[in-house]
């Protein structure tokens, strides 16, 4: 059966059919037959959301709305099933006629979250997101920003900024070279004779030495604390807690 829609429509609408028979006419509402212009739906999402700050430059998705719901979009025309694994919950994505898969999550708590795309059973990183070491592997991440109360971990104008340095050292315990990340306060280069206290800051489970400076913004936290007088200038050393036992991922040791 074919019909022509003469009036332009936007959004989702019910389709009604009138069947003429010997005993009169009947009106049926096939409420599962819905149509929409997919480009209009995408545009509607963009109007009420903003790009996640953890996106690669130029990527429009993932996006976040005012309720902290995340919107994911992924192009995979040959895939048969895709899910987003975020915050311990798997969301089934829906495929459109152009091969784009989309989904909206439940509201997320503010802060940083790891997530994965599960494409036909294979867990992969989202090419639209920067990757971070977490969950014992390289993973995609999405940052749900706080409001004004989150300024303590954001870089501020007029605040002297320190540095995070990647340092290589030889471990006598492991008999191998290792890497650690070291924060130095803004005054460090101009006070070469000053001795500073040292804070050794460990990451969470499944992360590594980059966690606090990359996902945790510790350098901005330290800069702001020092500038406000709430903290004395100090060095912060961040090393990997993976000393003896290897990380395990999905029940198997990493190879």
Model-inferred region functions:
Residues 1-42, 147:
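Extracytoplasmic
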Residues 16-18, 74, 80-143:
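Alpha-glucan (starch/glycogen) binding determinants
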Residues 27-29, 85-87, 114-118, 127-129, ...:
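Short, solvent-exposed loop/turn and secondary-structure capping segments
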Residues 30-51, 139-156:
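Extracytoplasmic/periplasmic copper-protein system
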Residues 43-75:
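Extracellular ectodomain segments of secreted/surface proteins
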Residues 63-77, 90, 94-97, 105-106, ...:
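N-terminal cap/lid segment of alpha/beta-hydrolase-fold proteins
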Residues 162, 168-176, 199-255:
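Cap/lid segment of the alpha/beta-hydrolase catalytic domain
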Residues 187-194, 226-230:
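Surface-exposed acidic, glycine-flexible loop patches that form ligand/cofactor-binding
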